[in-house]
Swiss-Prot record:
The gene is rps18. Its main location: plastid. Signal peptide: none annotated. Residues 1-19 have a biased composition (Basic residues). GO terms for biological process: translation. Residues 1-26 are annotated as: Disordered. The lineage of its organism: Eukaryota, Viridiplantae, Streptophyta, Embryophyta, Tracheophyta. This is Small ribosomal subunit protein bS18c. Keywords: Chloroplast, Plastid, Ribonucleoprotein, Ribosomal protein, RNA-binding, rRNA-binding. SUPFAM superfamilies: Ribosomal protein S18. Gene3D superfamilies: Ribosomal protein S18. Belongs to the bacterial ribosomal protein bS18 family. GO terms for cellular component: chloroplast; mitochondrial small ribosomal subunit. GO terms for molecular function: small ribosomal subunit rRNA binding; structural constituent of ribosome. InterPro entries: Ribosomal_bS18, Ribosomal_bS18_sf.
Length: 101
């Protein structure tokens, strides 16, 4: 068969399947902080299932574990870096106030 008459064919490339983020030995539990923290964003939000590459059941278990850890105050509800910064206080004056013109 002539090359111009051949149907379009995709080149067969071998691809390497990525390892699942949760191994068979990993236990999804609210006390397993090293596992849970992998599925949180920098702001402390739960990452989506597509981002995590988890199955539906795994994502549900991760979500429940994160929520339990938040309620038991093992995890913060939000990571606010601004909240930790302190603003310098303005010194108070004890004398009478004067108006500036």
């Amino acid at each position: 068969m002539d090359k111009s008459k051949q149907p379009f064919r995709k080149s067969k490339r071998s691809f390497r399947r990525r390892l699942p983020p949760i191994g068979s030995g990993d236990q999804i539990d609210y006390r397993n902080m090293s596992l849970i923290s992998r599925f949180l964003s920098e702001q402390g939000k739960i990452l989506s299932r597509r981002t995590n590459r988890l199955t539906l059941k795994q994502q549900r278990l991760i979500t429940i574990a994160i929520k339990q850890a938040r309620i038991l105050s093992l995890l913060p509800f939000r990571n606010n870096e601004k909240q930790l910064e302190r603003v310098e206080s303005i010194p108070r004056t004890t004398g009478p106030r004067t108006k500036n013109k």
